[in-house]
From Swiss-Prot:
Signal peptide: none
GO cellular component: DNA-directed RNA polymerase complex
Organism of this sequence: Roseiflexus sp. (strain RS-1)
Regions of compositional bias (Basic and acidic residues) in chain numbering: 279-294
Protein name per its UniProtKB record: DNA-directed RNA polymerase subunit beta'
Underlying gene: rpoC
Pfam families cross-referenced by the UniProt entry: RNA_pol_Rpb1_1, RNA_pol_Rpb1_2, RNA_pol_Rpb1_3, RNA_pol_Rpb1_4, RNA_pol_Rpb1_5
Length: 1504
C-alpha cells in the first residue's frame, strides 16, 4: 500500500558530508564534459557514465553489454552499470574539496546565520572567510599565563637595570662636583696671593718713588722749583714756587692718598676674585643639579615607557581570545609577543575548526536564555536572535559545522544538459561552467598543497575556490557576478529555483502538458450550454491513442503500429471511430489569463469542420472572452476519475453562478438582449393595437396571418398569473374548471412568444425585458429548481439515472443546473432569432444631435465669461476660478447628455441598444451626439477647456489634440493595471491558499455584527450582506421577542425578507473572521457557497476562491490617484487598485487620518500658525466632609486647597474639636451642612494637524470622541486602529474599506471573500513574554497554536506566554506561513529555504501549493475524499494490529511497532493533525476510529 508519494509530510534540513557521499555515485575529478570527437562523456568528468549512468538505455559506455537482458550488470571494462538512461536525471556525484568552503546562503543571508552562531559581525566573518583577516581558533591558556609571567619578569628586570644605571650616574655626578669645587677653592687662594704680592710690589714702588722725591725735595728745600714737580701725575709744586716744609707735608699727604687708593683697589680686586669664584661654584652646582634632574626625568620616562609597553603587551596577551579577528600586522605582532600561545587561521577551515572545537549548543542555549531574561534593549534583541538560531540547530538535529562544505554535491547531468546545435556547436547549462571553475580550482589547490607551495599562493587559491563555490550556489550574491560569453550572468543553483523562470514557478506549480492544443475561438450559436465545437483535425491529434486503440479493437488494424499508420494517412474510417471515441467525452477549455476558476471549464466536444474552436456565447462572460481573435487552449482529462470529476464539478452547465457574488454568470448579453428587448417592446398604435383574443393560440394565429404587429398592444385571456410586476393593465377572471387562475392581460405577441420559451414556473412576465430582466430569469430559474420543495421524486430520479445515488441536496443542485442551462439555451436561441428578425442596425443618421445643444453651450459660455470677469477684478482666487469653470462645463455636459436622452427615438436602434443594456451607454452616446466635455491632462488634472464638439460633428484640431491626452493615459493605465492586478492576485492566492473547509463546526461563540447603518458606507444593502450567512445567536423579533431563527440557522431568502419587513437593523452572524478551526475554516463560519447557493461542502478551497474573487475584478479598478476638483489638496485619496493594495498590505495610507488616542473632549488650538488638536480626558473625584453644627469653614467657596490643608474648625472654645482636613487636593465647594473637595484629573493628548488636513465631520470644540475615532478626514492607519480599538475594529475597517473601493467601481464581491483574506492577515501573534513556553520574545506564532500551547502550559501549572495580535500585510503573511514549500514558491526563495533548512522544518502539506509542488492530489474537493478513504484504510490496518483488550502493549510482543507508529503518524497528518500530536484533529479522529478500535499509544503518550 505504501507508494513512493504516499507520504504526508516533507522535511528539509542541512546535508551532512556523509549524506552527500551517500547520495553520490562517484567523485567528479575532471572538468571535462564530453569528448568533441566521439561526442561521448569523458571518464570522471561532469557527464561521466560510470558515475551518472549510461546515456543510452541498456548500453554501457564501451558497448560490451547491450540490450535489456544485461540489466544491472556493471561492465568490467568501462565500469558503467547497464540500466535505463533516465537514471541520469537522478544520480548525483560529488567533488571532494581540498579545503572546506562556506555555504554562501548561511554567510550572506540576513541575518548571517554563521555570524550569529559565532557572535561575529558579518563583515568580520566575510574577511575571515575570504582570507583578508585571521581568526584565533585555539588558545593555550597555560602557555598564555606563562607568557604573561615571563613578560612581567622581563620588564621587572629591565626596570631594575635602568634604576641601577641611574644610581651609578648620580654618584659619578656628585664625585665630579666635589672635585670641581675643590679645584676652584685652591685656585681662589692662588689668586688672592697673586693680588697681595702685586699690590705689595706696587706699594713698595710708590713708597720708593715718594722716598726718592722726598730726598730730592729735602735737598732743594728753600729753592725755587725750576719746573713743575709732579708726584704720580699730581702737581706738587709749580715752576718758580719755593720748596718748603709744606711741600714735604703735601708729598706725605699725597703718598697717604695714593696708598689708600691702592689699598681700596686691592680690596676691590680681592672681592672681585672671590665673587668670580662664588659664581663659578654656583654655576657648577646648578649644572650638577640640572644634570641630576635630567637623569631623574630620563629614568622616570624610561620606567613609564616600560610600564606602558608592559601594559600594552600584557593587554595584547590578554586579548588573545578565541574568535578574535586579527589583521596581518596584528597577527605578526602577536606571534612575536606570544609565540606558541595561540593558533590563528583564515578561511572556512578556520571557521569550521572553531565551530567543531568550541560550540556546545546546549550550554550556549542556556547562556543565551539567561541573557534574554536578564538584559534589556539591544543586548536582549541580539541574544534573542542568536538564541533563535541555536534553538533551531538544537531542535532540528542539524550540526552547525554542516554550514561549511567539505564535500560538494554535483547534480545529475540531465538537469544541466549539454546539447548540440545545428552548426556543430554546443549549448550547455551555465551550471556546467560553474562546476568546471570549481573543479579546476580544486585540482589546482590540491596540486599546490602537494608541492608545499608558499602560504600566500595556497591562500589565494583557497579564496578562489571559495568564490567559485559561492558563484555555483548563488552567483552575484557577493561581489561581481561571474559572467560567461557575451557578458551574460551565469545562472547558479539559486537562480534555478527562484523567480518566475525558477524551478518552483516554472516546472512545479505550472507544467506544460501533453494532450492539449490551442486555437482561435469563434461563436457557436447552435451549441448547447455544455458543448463546444472542436475542429476535427485537432480532435484527431488530441485523441490519437484512443482512436488507435479503437481501430485495433474494431479490427481495422492488427496492431498499434498499423493503427498509427491508418491515423496518419487519415483514412475515412478514422472519422467514424473518432466520432465514437469522442461521444460523451469531456474536454477542458481554458482562456488565459486564468483569473478565476471559471476560466477553465469542461465541455462535451462536438466535432466540427474548420480550424477554430466554437464556444457557446453565454460562457463568454465567465471566460472574459470575445471573438476578436482570442485563443483558447483545450486539454483532455485522461483517466476515468478525471473525466468524472470534470463532469461533476467543471461542466459549464454546473457553473452557472459566480463564486464571487452568487449572481448568475451565464447571463445573455448583446444580440440576445437586443432580440429579447425588441420582442417585449410595446408600440402603441402599431397594426392590430387594442384587439382582443380569447386565447394565446388565437392571438398567435392572428400574428401568423399578418393581422397584428409583433409589438402591438393586444388583450389576451390566459390561464396563470403575472410573475412580478406588470407594466400593462391586468384583470383577474374567475378560475377555470380545474381551479387554475385566469386573467385578461394587455400584452403583445412578442411577449407571448417570449414567455412561451420560459419554463412554466417562471411565466408570465408582462414587462419590457432588458439585460437585468434576463439575469433575473436565470437566477429565479436556478433558485426555483434547486429548492427541494419544488421538485418531485421523478425529477430527482432523472438526475439519479445520470449520476447515481447522491445526497438529495446534491441531486437538487444538479437538477436545478440542468433546467437553468436549458432555459438559458432557449433564451439564447430566441434572442438571436429576433435580433435577426428585428434587423436592428446602426447608421450615422441614427445619431441625432439635440437642438437644445447650442442654447446649453451659449449659456455655459456666458457663465464662464462672468467668472473670468470676476477673477480679473480680483473678486475670486485662481483656485476658485478654476473650480467654477470646471463645474460650469461639467453641468453643461450633464445637460447635453440629458438633452440627447430626451431627443432619442425610443424605438430607434440606438435607443434600444442603450436602454436594453445590450451595448453602449448614454455617456458614449452623449459623446457621439452631444459633446465630449472635459478631458484630463497626463497628471490627471482636468483641463478647463472643454471639447464642445461631438463625434458626429467632428473635432477641431485643438480639440482632437486635447482629447489625445486622455486616450493615451487610458491605454498606459490599462497596461500597468493589468500587471499590478495580476501581482495582487498572486499575493492573495498565496496568503489564502491553505484555507480549505476542513470541519463542520469549530464551535466558536464569536461572530460578527452586521449593521443596517453601515449600508451607506459600503454601498450595499443590509439584506445582501446577511444572505447566506449562519446566525451566531438566535434572531429575535424586536417587537414581540419571538425567536425567528436559532443559532447556526442559515439566513435564506425567506428570512431576509422577514428581516426587511420587521426592519431588523443588526444581526450577529458567523464569520470566517471569528472561525477557530486549527487548520482551514469550518462550514458554519463560512456559510453559503455562493457558486451553488447551498451550505459550503467540506473540501471547498475557499481561500483560493476568495483570492480569485478579489483579484479577478482588479483590472477593472482604476489605477490613478483621484484629485477631487483636479487640484492636489488634503482630500487627495488613493482610490482603485493602489488603495486595494494599501489595504491588503496593511500599509500606512497616503493622506493618513489623525485618530483620537483616548476618549475625551476635543479642544482646537492655534499656536503661531500651527493648528493643534487636543483631546482631553477628565475624571472628577469628590471628597465630601460633613460640617457639624458648631463648625465653620476657614476657606472660601471655590478656593484651591492641597492635601492636609484645614477646611473647617470648631467656633466654640469650650469644645476642643479636631479641625476638618482636606484628604485630597482640589477645589472647595461649600454646601448646606457639608464641605466638599473636587479633584479633576486630566489626561491630555495633543497632535499637530497639517495645514492641508480637514477636520472630520462633527469634530469641533467641545465634541466628545472615543479612542480610534477620526479627528481629520482621510484613511486610518490599520496598525494604529489595531492598537487603539483592537482586533474586531480593524477587521471591520479593512473589510469595509476594501468593499468601498470595489463598489465605487461597480464591482460586486461578497464580504466573506474579503473576510477570509483579512483573517489570514490577523492569524499571527507576536510573543512578548514567553513564560514557561519554549517560544522566544518577538517570535511570530499562529494564534490558534498559541492558545493551544498556553492551555497546555496552564494545565501543567506553568506560566503562560503573553502576546499581542499582529496585523501583517499579505506578502509578509504569505512568507510566515507554516509551509516552507508554499513560502519558497512565492518570494524570497533562498531566504525561506535557508531558514527552513536550519530549523529542519516539516511541511505537513496542508495547503494546495505544497501538494501541487510535490505532485500529490490537492487536499480539496475530491482530494479530501481521497485522504479520508486513505485514513480509513490505515485505521483498518491499525484495527487488525491493535489488540482490543488493552492499550498498553509490551515491547517484545510488538515486532512491527515502528511500522505501526509510522502508520499512525500518517493517519494523523491525513486527518489534519501534526505528525507528533494526536490532540489536533478537531474530533474527526475519534469519529473515524469508532468505538471498537483501540489505537496503541505513542511512547510520549505513555510518558504523559
Amino acid at each position: 500500500m505504501l507508494e513512493i508519494n504516499d507520504f504526508s509530510a516533507i522535511r528539509i534540513s542541512l546535508a551532512s558530508p556523509e549524506d552527500i557521499l551517500s547520495w553520490s555515485h562517484g567523485e567528479v575529478t575532471k572538468p571535462e564534459t564530453i569528448n568533441y570527437r566521439t561526442l561521448k562523456p569523458e571518464r570522471d568528468g561532469l557527464f561521466c557514465e560510470r558515475i551518472f549512468g549510461p546515456t543510452k538505455d541498456w548500453e554501457c559506455y564501451c558497448g560490451k553489454y547491450k540490450r535489456v537482458r544485461y540489466k544491472g550488470v556493471v561492465c568490467d571494462k568501462c565500469g558503467v552499470e547497464v540500466t535505463r538512461s533516465k537514471v541520469r536525471r537522478e544520480r548525483m556525484g560529488h567533488i571532494s574539496l581540498a579545503s572546506p568552503v562556506s555555504h554562501i546562503w548561511f554567510v550572506k543571508g540576513t541575518p548571517s546565520r554563521l555570524g550569529l552562531l559565532l557572535d561575529i559581525s558579518p563583515r568580520n566573518l566575510e574577511r575571515v572567510l575570504y582570507f583578508a583577516s585571521y581568526m584565533i581558533v585555539h588558545v593555550d591558556e597555560e602557555l598564555k599565563a606563562q607568557a604573561r609571567e615571563a613578560l612581567q619578569a622581563e620588564y621587572r628586570e629591565k626596570r631594575e637595570r635602568i634604576q641601577q644605571e641611574a644610581e651609578s650616574k648620580q654618584i659619578e655626578l656628585s664625585t665630579q662636583l666635589t672635585q670641581d669645587l675643590g679645584g676652584m677653592e685652591s685656585a681662589q687662594i692662588t689668586t688672592q696671593r697673586r693680588i697681595e704680592e702685586e699690590y705689595r710690589r706696587l706699594r713698595d714702588e710708590i713708597s720708593a718713588e715718594a722716598e726718592r722725591l722726598r730726598s730730592d725735595l729735602e735737598e732743594k728745600q728753600g729753592e725755587a722749583a725750576e719746573e713743575d714737580i709732579l708726584f704720580r701725575g699730581t702737581v706738587l709744586i709749580e715752576e718758580g714756587e719755593i720748596i718748603t716744609e709744606k711741600t714735604l707735608d703735601a708729598l706725605d699727604e699725597l703718598l697717604d692718598q695714593e696708598l689708600e687708593t691702592l689699598e681700596q683697589r686691592k680690596q676691590r680686586d680681592l672681592e672681585d676674585a672671590e665673587q668670580l669664584t662664588g659664581a663659578e661654584r654656583e654655576r657648577k652646582e646648578y649644572e650638577a643639579s640640572q644634570e641630576r634632574e635630567r637623569l631623574q626625568e630620563r629614568l622616570q620616562s624610561e620606567l613609564d615607557r616600560l610600564v606602558r609597553e608592559e601594559k600594552e603587551r600584557l593587554e595584547q596577551i590578554d586579548s588573545i581570545k578565541l574568535k578574535r579577528i586579527l589583521s596581518e600586522q596584528e597577527y605578526r605582532a602577536l606571534r612575536e609577543i606570544a609565540p606558541g600561545v595561540f593558533r590563528a587561521d583564515m578561511g572556512a577551515g578556520a571557521v569550521r575548526d572553531m565551530i567543531v572545537r568550541t560550540i556546545d549548543l546546549d550550554k550556549l542555549a542556556e547562556e543565551l536564555q539567561n541573557e534574554v531574561y536578564t538584559t534589556q534593549g539591544q543586548r536582549r534583541k541580539k541574544a534573542t536572535k542568536r538564541l533563535r538560531v541555536v534553538e533551531a540547530f538544537r531542535k532540528s538535529g542539524n550540526r552547525p559545522e554542516w554550514m561549511i562544505l567539505t564535500v560538494l554535491p554535483v547534480i545529475p547531468p540531465d538537469l544541466r544538459p549539454m546539447v548540440q546545435l545545428d552548426g556543430g556547436r554546443f549549448a550547455t547549462s551555465d551550471l556546467n561552467d560553474l562546476y568546471r571553475r570549481v573543479i579546476n580550482r580544486n585540482n589546482r589547490l590540491k596540486r599546490l598543497m602537494e608541492l608545499n607551495a608558499p602560504e600566500i599562493i595556497v591562500r589565494n587559491e583557497k579564496r578562489m575556490l571559495q568564490e567559485a563555490v559561492d558563484a555555483l550556489i548563488d552567483n552575484g550574491r557577493r561581489g561581481r557576478a561571474v559572467s560567461g560569453k557575451g557578458k551574460h550572468r551565469l545562472k547558479s543553483l539559486s537562480d534555478m529555483l527562484k523567480g518566475k523562470q525558477g524551478r518552483f514557478r516554472q516546472n512545479l506549480l505550472g507544467k506544460r502538458v501533453d494532450y492539449s492544443g490551442r486555437s482561435v475561438i469563434v461563436v457557436g450559436p447552435d451549441l448547447k450550454l455544455h458543448q463546444c465545437g472542436l475542429p476535427k483535425k485537432m480532435a484527431l491529434e488530441l485523441f490519437k491513442p484512443f482512436v488507435m486503440r479503437r481501430l485495433v479493437e474494431k479490427g481495422f488494424a492488427h496492431n498499434i503500429k498499423s493503427a498509427k499508420r491508418i491515423v496518419e494517412r487519415v483514412r475515412p474510417e478514422v472519422w467514424d471511430v473518432l466520432e465514437e471515441v469522442i461521444k460523451d467525452y469531456l474536454v477542458l477549455l481554458n482562456r488565459a489569463p486564468s483569473l478565476h476558476r471559471l476560466s477553465i471549464q469542461a465541455f462535451e466536444a462536438k466535432l466540427i469542420e474548420g480550424s477554430a474552436i466554437q464556444l457557446h456565447p453565454l460562457v463568454c462572460a465567465a471566460f472574459n472572452a470575445d471573438f476578436d481573435g482570442d485563443q483558447m487552449a483545450v486539454h483532455v482529462p485522461l483517466s476515468r476519475k478525471a473525466q468524472e470529476e470534470a463532469r461533476m464539478r467543471m461542466l459549464s452547465k454546473y457553473n452557472l453562478l459566480s463564486p464571487a457574488t452568487g449572481d448568475p454568470i451565464i447571463t445573455p448579453s448583446q444580440d440576445i438582449v437586443l432580440g429579447c428587448y425588441y420582442l417585449t417592446m410595446v408600440k402603441d398604435g402599431a397594426k392590430g393595437s387594442g384587439k382582443m383574443f380569447a386565447s394565446i393560440d388565437e392571438a398567435l394565429l392572428a400574428y401568423d396571418k399578418g393581422l397584428i404587429d409583433i409589438q402591438a398592444p393586444i388583450f389576451v385571456r390566459m390561464t396563470g398569473t403575472v410573475y412580478g410586476e406588470s407594466d400593462r393593465p391586468v384583470r383577474m377572471l374567475s378560475p377555470d374548471e380545474n381551479g387554475a387562475p385566469r386573467m385578461l392581460l394587455e400584452t403583445t405577441i412578442g411577449r407571448i412568444i417570449f414567455n412561451n420559451e420560459l419554463l412554466e414556473p417562471l411565466r408570465f412576465r408582462n414587462r419590457l425585458i432588458a439585460k437585468k430582466g434576463l439575469r433575473e430569469i436565470i437566477a429565479d430559474c436556478y433558485k426555483y429548481y434547486t429548492n427541494l420543495n419544488n421538485l418531485t421524486e421523478a425529477d430527482l430520479d432523472t438526475i439519479r439515472a445520470m449520476y447515481g445515488d447522491r445526497p438529495r441536496d446534491d441531486l437538487a443542485r444538479y437538477f436545478g443546473s440542468e433546467m437553468t442551462a436549458s432555459q438559458a439555451d432557449r433564451i439564447k436561441t430566441l434572442g438571436f432569432r429576433y435580433a435577426t428578425r428585428g434587423g436592428m442596425t446602426i447608421g450615422v443618421d441614427d445619431i441625432e444631435i439635440p437642438p437644445k445643444k447650442q442654447d446649453i453651450l451659449a449659456e455655459a459660455e456666458k457663465r464662464v465669461t462672468e467668472v473670468e470677469r470676476q477673477f480679473r477684478r480680483g473678486l475670486i482666487t485662481e483656485e476658485e476660478r478654476y473650480r467654477e469653470i470646471v463645474e460650469i462645463w461639467q453641468n453643461a455636459t450633464k445637460q447635453t447628455t440629458e438633452a440627447v436622452k430626451q431627443h432619442l427615438n425610443p424605438f430607434g436602434p440606438v435607443a434600444m441598444m442603450v436602454n436594453s443594456a445590450a451595448r453602449g451607454n448614454i455617456n458614449q452616446l452623449s459623446q457621439m451626439a452631444g459633446m465630449r466635455g472635459l478631458m484630463s491632462d497626463p497628471t490627471g488634472r482636468i483641463i478647463e477647456l472643454p471639447i464642445k464638439s461631438n463625434f458626429r460633428e467632428g473635432l477641431s484640431v485643438l480639440e482632437y489634440f486635447v482629447s489625445t491626452h486622455g486616450g493615451r493615459k487610458g491605454l498606459a493605465d490599462t497596461a500597468l493595471r493589468t500587471a499590478d492586478a495580476g501581482y495582487l492576485t498572486r499575493r492573495l492566492i498565496d496568503v489564502a491558499q491553505d484555507n480549505i473547509v476542513t470541519i463542520d463546526d469549530c464551535g466558536t461563540d464569536e461572530g460578527l455584527w452586521i449593521y443596517r447603518a453601515d449600508d451607506r458606507e459600503v454601498l450595499q444593502d443590509f439584506e445582501q450582506r446577511i444572505l447566506g450567512r449562519l446566525l451566531a445567536a438566535p434572531l429575535v423579533d424586536p417587537r414581540t421577542g419571538e425567536i425567528l431563527a436559532n443559532r447556526n440557522d442559515e439566513i435564506d431568502e425567506a428570512l431576509v425578507r422577514k428581516c426587511k419587513e420587521l426592519a431588523i437593523d443588526a444581526v450577529y452572524v458567523r464569520s470566517p473572521l471569528a472561525c477557530k478551526a486549527d487548520y482551514g475554516i469550518c462550514r458554519m463560519c463560512y456559510g453559503r457557497n455562493l457558486a451553488t447557493g447551498k451550505l459550503v461542502d467540506i473540501g471547498e478551497a475557499v481561500g483560493i476562491i476568495a483570492a480569485q474573487s478579489i483579484g479577478e475584478p482588479g483590472t477593472q479598478l482604476t489605477l490613478r490617484t483621484f484629485h477631487t476638483g483636479g487640484v492636489a489638496s488634503a482630500d487627495d485619496i488613493t482610490q482603485g487598485l493602489p488603495r486595494v493594495q494599501e489595504i491588503f498590505e496593511a500599509r500606512t495610507p497616503k493622506g493618513k487620518a489623525i485618530l483620537a488616542e483616548i476618549d475625551g473632549i476635543v479642544e482646537l488650538v492655534r499656536e503661531d500658525e500651527v493648528r493643534k488638536i487636543r483631546v482631553v480626558a477628565t475624571e472628577l473625584y469628590t471628597d465630601d466632609h460633613e460640617l457639624p453644627p458648631h463648625y465653620e469653614p476657614v476657606v472660601a467657596d471655590g478656593a484651591q486647597v492641597n492635601e492636609g490643608d484645614v477646611l473647617a474648625q470648631s467656633n466654640r472654645a469650650d469644645l476642643n474639636g479636631e479641625p476638618i482636613v482636606a484628604r485630597i487636593a482640589g477645589v472647595v465647594r461649600i454646601g448646606a451642612g457639608q464641605i466638599s473637595v473636587i479633584n479633576e484629573e486630566r489626561e491630555v493628548r495633543e497632535v499637530v494637524a497639517p495645514h492641508t488636513a480637514r477636520l472630520a465631520p462633527g469634530i469641533e470644540n467641545g465634541a466628545r470622541v472615543v479612542a480610534g475615532q477620526h479627528l481629520t478626514e482621510g484613511s486610518a492607519d490599520p496598525q494604529e486602529l489595531l492598537a487603539l480599538q483592537g482586533r474586531e475594529a480593524v477587521q471591520r475597517y479593512l473589510v469595509n474599506e476594501a468593499q468601498k473601493v470595489y463598489r465605487s467601481q461597480g464591482v460586486d464581491i461578497n464580504d466573506k471573500h474579503i473576510e477570509v483574506i483579512v483573517r489570514q492577515m490577523l492569524r499571527r501573534v507576536r510573543i512578548e513574554e514567553p513564560g514557561d513556553t519554549d517560544y522566544l520574545p518577538g517570535e511570530l506564532i499562529d494564534s490558534t497554536e498559541f492558545v493551544r500551547k498556553n492551555a497546555e502550559i496552564i494545565s501543567q501549572g506553568g506560566e503562560p506566554a503573553t502576546a499581542s495580535t499582529m496585523l501583517l500585510g499579505i506578502t509578509k503573511a504569505s512568507l510566515t506561513t507554516d509551509s516552507f514549500l508554499a513560502a519558497a514558491s512565492f518570494q524570497e526563495t533562498t531566504r525561506v529555504l535557508t531558514e527552513a533548512a536550519i530549523t529542519g522544518k516539516v511541511d505537513y502539506l496542508r495547503g494546495l501549493k505544497e501538494n501541487v509542488v510535490i505532485g500529490k492530489l490537492i487536499p480539496a474537493g475530491t482530494g479530501i475524499e481521497k485522504r479520508r478513504q486513505l485514513a480509513e484504510e490505515i485505521i483498518g490496518e491499525l484495527a487488525n494490529v491493535a489488540p482490543a483488550t488493552s492499550t498498553a502493549v509490551v515491547e517484545q510482543e510488538r515486532p512491527d511497532r515502528e511500522a505501526d507508529e509510522a502508520l499512525r503518524r500518517r493517519l494523523r497528518a491525513l486527518i489534519g493533525g501534526d505528525g507528533d500530536d494526536g490532540e489536533r484533529n478537531n474530533g474527526d479522529f475519534d469519529d473515524q476510529v469508532g468505538e471498537d478500535v483501540v489505537i496503541p499509544p505513542d511512547d510520549d503518550d505513555q510518558e504523559a
